[in-house]
Amino acid sequence: MSQDYLWFLAAVFFALIGFGLHYAQKHPTRWALRFQVTTSVILIVWAIIILVIQFLIVVEASKKVEPGLDYVIVLGGRIKENGKPSKALRERLDMVVDYARDNQDTYFVLSGGRGEDEPCTEAEGMAEYLIEEGVRKDRLLVELQSRNTHQNIWYSKALIEKNIQDNLGTMNGNLGDNAGPVLVAEEKPKRIGILTSDFHLFRAMGLARKAEYREFYGISAKCDVWLYLHFAMRETLAILKDKFMGYM
């Protein structure tokens, strides 16, 4: 569902509420009074829900960045018609550039398929931007199929697990054909970061928890206030939807 569509639905909803309250004041019957009370309760409950969710979003986004992670999953965003990342996505990628410079052993999983109005997959657009900014290509893994945050989390987890197994196979292959049976002790869990915009991080972390990530940390890319406010309503609805669907 597009952002504009959500704003339109919200505008229609509050317009209907406003019309109903105005009508109830002009025609003060018993049913009108009940409508006023019911509507007021709904609005108060909705306001409390929004405030609680926004508080949780701010708390999650304020946590300290964990250094030295094995993998960082970078959640995709819109790629513009000219192939360049949107403002919100560019802020995420600039955070990747900084983290890559300070943490030389970290791999980055770029997660995002191709939207209807995008010239390429979000993962490919992100990879191109990061390579231009000096991040080595061999540190990038691309996940090209996901279409939403839920899929970002699950598909990226599968890609990381495959990469770990491939590296383990390479290690065993280097031992030679005559090495005999090899017992490999279970490795400690890989430390995984999830990097996305500040308004988006709380939901992404909830989805990762449901997907049974073992040791994971959030990395928040700050966005400007107006962009945050623009996404606040959509993210609130998305969190409620994912909670209802059992994704969080």
Per-region residue spans from a language model:
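Membrane-embedded alpha-helical segments of integral membrane proteins
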Residues: 1-25
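Alpha-helical transmembrane segments of integral membrane proteins
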Residues: 8-10, 34-44
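Alpha-helical transmembrane segments
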Residues: 15-19, 42-52
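Membrane-water interface at transmembrane helix exits
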Residues: 21-25, 49-57, 241
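Membrane-interface helix-boundary motifs at transmembrane edges
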Residues: 24-36
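Transmembrane helix-loop junctions in multipass membrane proteins, especially transporters and channels
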Residues: 26, 58-62, 246-247
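A structural signal for short, hydrophobic/glycine-enriched beta-strand patches
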Residues: 45, 51-234
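A transmembrane-helix-recognition feature enriched in membrane-embedded lipid enzymes
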Residues: 229-248
